[in-house]
Structures are given as C-alpha cells and as structure tokens.
C-alpha cells in the first residue's frame, strides 16, 4: 500500500504507477497541514481516473474518520451535488490556528454554522454573520466549533466522492510548497524602483514548475544614464 499527498496527482503518473505496481494499493491523500495533512482519501484505480470530469487529476475521495467536510458557497450555504463550491474542513484533526498570526487565524478558521446540529448535514446552513456568532457564542471557540476555510474549489459527485477543481485564489503549489503569489508581488512592489509587478508559475517542457516575475520600473523624468551616454 502506498499513500501519495502534498499536491494534486497527475493522471498520467497515476496510470504509470498502476501499470508498474499492479499489486500495490495506491491511495490519493488530500488535506492541508491545518487539518493534520490527510482529510480525505481515495483509492486510485483505472476506473477512478475516468470518474472525474475535471482536469487531469483523480478525485480526492471521501473524508476519513472523525472528519467533517462541507462544500459551501460564499455565504456558508451548502451547494447542491455537482455544483462547485469551497471546501471547508472540521473534526478532530483541526489545528488551533496559526502561531502568532491572529489575523490569519481569524480569516481561515471560521465559526462552524453546523455546530450543534447533525454531523455532516448538508441541508442546513446559516447565512449571516450575526447568526453564526450566536451559534458559537461570544467567547473563544473550541476546535469543534470551527471550520477551516481551505480556499480549494471542489464539487461533490452523486456517489459522495469529492473532486478537486483548483484554487479560488492565487495560491499555487510548487514542489509541494504552498506559495501566495500576492505576497511575492507585494515584496517586489516594496522596492522603490518597481512600479508594477506580477508573478506567475511557469512550467517547462519536462513539467518542472518555477516562478517567474515580471516588473515595470519607475522611470524618472529626464534621461537615464544610458540615454545620457548615447546622447553624448
């Protein structure tokens, strides 16, 4: 048995692994560090690769034991089966937050609108902030009263299997590391000579990814050194 995690699986690589390891059970493990790495799992087979209608990536499967998953819209309402939404995670594996980052903790670890209701009930949702606040009280929330907002775009299939569709923001993964492109752009823009900046992932012919940054320099009034030298 082999478990794979850290990044979205490539269908081509999965097919190659299945062909070379016919007697090995391959499991696609999904989950962020904020929920103790593995939150969902899916056994990879040739049929599972034909299951998904999204990009060339196999499904991430169903939640593991003592884990709750919800596919919600931007008002924390459950979306219908087959409709894309954002994946929220809860359960025993949920972290307490980010060390010394209360701002990021408040942004990503949100009150669980389903706390106190039947576990995994996808029919209920609480849409406004006042109701959500009352639902968990005014004091500090316990782990079971929170959900982690993953930023991952997914959808649930009729059989309950979850498909990963991509990110809802500019976060990318390169060699297993999560990278916020906006943070790099902000660092570039802090340079006094940079007027505009944009960062994008780039993939070469071998499939290897790296980051590429494009910047526009601030041009001072008058001739620069090169123009002055040419004029002289």
Protein language model features and the residues they cover:
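AMP-dependent adenylate-forming
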Residues: 19, 25-28, 43-120, 134-232
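Glycine-/small-residue-rich active-site loops that bind phosphorylated ligands and cofactors
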Residues: 9, 33, 205
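Conserved helix-loop-beta element of the AMP-binding
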Residues: 1-12, 20-29
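Acidic/polar hotspots within intrinsically disordered regions
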Residues: 126-128, 135
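SF2 helicase/translocase ATPase core recognition
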Residues: 30-37
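Specific aromatic-rich, kink-prone transmembrane helix
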Residues: 40
């Amino acid at each position: 048995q082999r478990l794979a995690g850290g990044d979205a699986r490539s269908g081509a690589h999965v097919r190659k692994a299945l062909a070379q390891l016919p007697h090995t059970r391959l499991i696609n493990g999904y989950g962020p560090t904020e929920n103790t790495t593995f939150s969902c799992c899916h056994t990879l087979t040739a049929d599972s690769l034909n299951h998904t209608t999204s990009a060339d990536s196999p499904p991430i499967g169903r939640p593991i034991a003592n884990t709750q998953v919800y596919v919600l819209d931007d008002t924390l309402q459950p979306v219908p089966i087959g409709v894309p939404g954002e994946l929220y995670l809860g359960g025993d594996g949920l972290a307490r937050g980010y060390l010394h980052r209360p701002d990021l903790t408040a942004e990503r670890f949100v009150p669980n609108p389903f706390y106190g209701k039947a576990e995994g009930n996808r029919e209920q949702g609480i849409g406004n902030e006042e109701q959500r606040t009352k639902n968990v009280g005014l004091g500090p929330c316990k782990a079971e009263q929170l959900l982690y907002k993953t930023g991952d775009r997914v959808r649930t299939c009729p059989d309950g299997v979850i498909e990963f569709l991509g990110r809802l923001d500019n976060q990318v993964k390169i060699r297993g590391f999560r990278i916020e492109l906006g943070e790099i752009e902000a660092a570039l823009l802090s340079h006094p000579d940079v007027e505009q900046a944009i960062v994008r992932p780039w993939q070469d012919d071998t499939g290897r990814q790296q980051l590429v940054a494009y910047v526009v320099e601030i041009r001072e009034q008058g001739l620069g050194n090169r123009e002055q030298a040419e004029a002289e």
